[in-house]
Swiss-Prot record:
Provenance organism: Penicillium citrinum
Name used for this protein in its record: Indoleamine 2,3-dioxygenase qulI
Family according to the record: Belongs to the indoleamine 2,3-dioxygenase family.
GO biological process terms held by the UniProt record: 'de novo' NAD biosynthetic process from L-tryptophan; L-tryptophan catabolic process to kynurenine
Classification of source organism: Eukaryota, Fungi, Dikarya, Ascomycota, Pezizomycotina
Top-tier EC class: oxidoreductase
PROSITE patterns: IDO_1
Length: 440
């Protein structure tokens, strides 16, 4: 391949327009009536959860074959439906259920094997393959209002808002992928103006993502997320404190030898977004954070392969470091790094609002929920993870070597970072204050 920008993105299930989102809208329902059992249950999932009848329905469900799934879109739809049903089964009772029904576990494992993704609730199940463009809006679809969810646990617009925020972020970021590929070529050709143009586009893209993320509070309350939605997004990993020391038991069909095995997977997490990891790879930030690397295992296989390819060819940071200390492109790179740090600060504020603060409050039934304080849906220590990712991002700045201060303006709506000029030292101090206030 002469030019990296000529890479066939479709071979990695990517689009030059929608990025990691499907180029064609995901299915709202499997077309074959054979799968009506699954689809009817998923459509009625909020009612079944609310009436505590999901367990009985799933335990009496017949085992359906995956042989009639006819296209990539159908396999993805099956994965979404089975993931929602499995998560609903595990977490809808007073205590988590440790054994999945075989009618869910067996096809979920087969579908996941086909799609090369983990057989559990993931970012792909909740967002990438679950959310579709709203018929009310035309192109381009880059705002939360432009999308709707096909499956939910609660039937609430608040839950849908949580998913469509993430999808709007993916939609905005997807258009950056061709520019990243061209920037790699630009470095090889020593075309500094093209690198400069890419960094400007990168900054604009991250600005747009921050504005979307900062809208989470418009239609999602703390209480709803923490007490009603968050439990369904959890995994079985690191969950001994709630009665899952070994994770979840996935039974096998007799044709597979019978019995089964205990599997402990992380819950769905935005750390499973390939887009954000691609941004890190592109700028050369956060390359040694173990949790981020682990989360690649929960991405669709083709997306994971694309990130591995990009890791092997990423060349922007070495090129920037080769430029003179007075290079305006070097300063622009630092500006891009600080934008990415600003995004992580915005994420910190969202986590504080929806996990850390309500964790110390009484839930609607009057019981305090302290056993998971400080843990994200992925099962990790959220504060440790956020510290590590932000510090890794900031450490990529080059400004120390040129003896001057990088001054930067952040999007006005990102309250954590402020709207005025801010240098790297100030950003670190502000971030530390935010973390200390949250932990207190």
């Amino acid at each position: 391949m002469k030019h990296f920008r000529d890479l066939d993105l479709s071979s990695y299930s990517l689009s030059s327009v929608s990025g990691f989102l499907p180029e064609r809208p995901a299915l709202e329902r499997l077309p074959n009536p054979y799968y009506d059992h699954w689809e009817d249950l998923s459509r009625n999932l909020p009612q079944l959860v609310a009436s505590d009848t999901l367990k009985d329905k799933l335990e009496r469900l017949p085992i359906l074959s995956t042989a009639l799934l006819d296209s990539e879109e159908e396999w993805r739809r099956a994965y979404v439906v089975l993931s929602f049903l499995s998560q609903g089964y595990i977490w809808s009772g007073d205590q988590p259920r440790r054994n999945l029904p075989i009618a869910i576990a067996a096809p979920l494992r087969r579908v996941s094997e086909y799609l090369t993704i983990m057989p559990c609730g993931t970012f792909a199940a909740y967002c990438l393959w679950n959310v579709i463009p709203s018929p009310k809006f035309g192109n381009p679809q880059i705002n939360p209002e432009d999308f709707i969810s096909t499956c939910t646990f609660t039937g609430s617009k608040e839950e849908e808002w949580f998913y469509v925020i993430s999808v709007a972020i993916e939609a905005r970021g997807g258009r950056l992928i061709p520019k990243i590929l061209d920037a790699i070529d630009a470095v090889k050709e020593n075309d500094t103006p093209r690198v400069r143009s890419f960094l400007e586009a990168f900054i604009t893209c991250v600005d747009g993502i921050i504005l979307v993320l900062d809208r989470m509070g418009e239609n999602l309350s703390q209480e709803f997320f923490y007490h009603r939605l968050r439990p369904y997004l959890r995994g079985g990993k690191n969950m001994a404190q709630v009665g899952l020391p070994d994770g979840i038991f996935y039974p096998l069909c007799q044709c597979e030898g019978g019995e089964g095995e205990w599997l402990a997977y992380s819950g769905g997490s935005n750390a499973q977004s390939s887009l954000i990891q691609l941004m890190d790879i592109t700028l050369g930030t956060c390359q040694n954070v173990e949790f981020i690397k682990e989360m690649r295992n929960y991405m669709p296989g083709p997306h994971r392969e694309f990130l591995e390819l990009m890791t092997s060819v990423s060349n922007i940071r070495p090129y920037i470091l080769s430029l003179g200390n007075d290079s305006d492109v070097r300063s622009l790179y630092d500006k891009a790094v600080l934008r990415l740090a600003a995004l992580r600060d915005c994420h910190l504020r969202v986590v504080a609002r929806y996990i850390l603060i309500p964790a110390g409050k009484k839930n609607p039934s009057g019981h305090r929920q302290l056993q998971e304080r400080g843990r994200g849906t992925g099962g990790t220590d959220i504060m440790k993870f956020l510290r590590e990712t932000r510090n890794n991002t900031l450490s990529a700045c080059c400004e120390q070597s040129k003896g001057s201060t990088v001054v930067q303006t952040y999007p006005k709506r990102c309250e954590t970072c402020g709207s005025g000029p801010i240098d790297r030292t100030t950003l670190i101090k502000k971030a530390t204050v935010v973390i200390n206030e949250i932990e207190c």
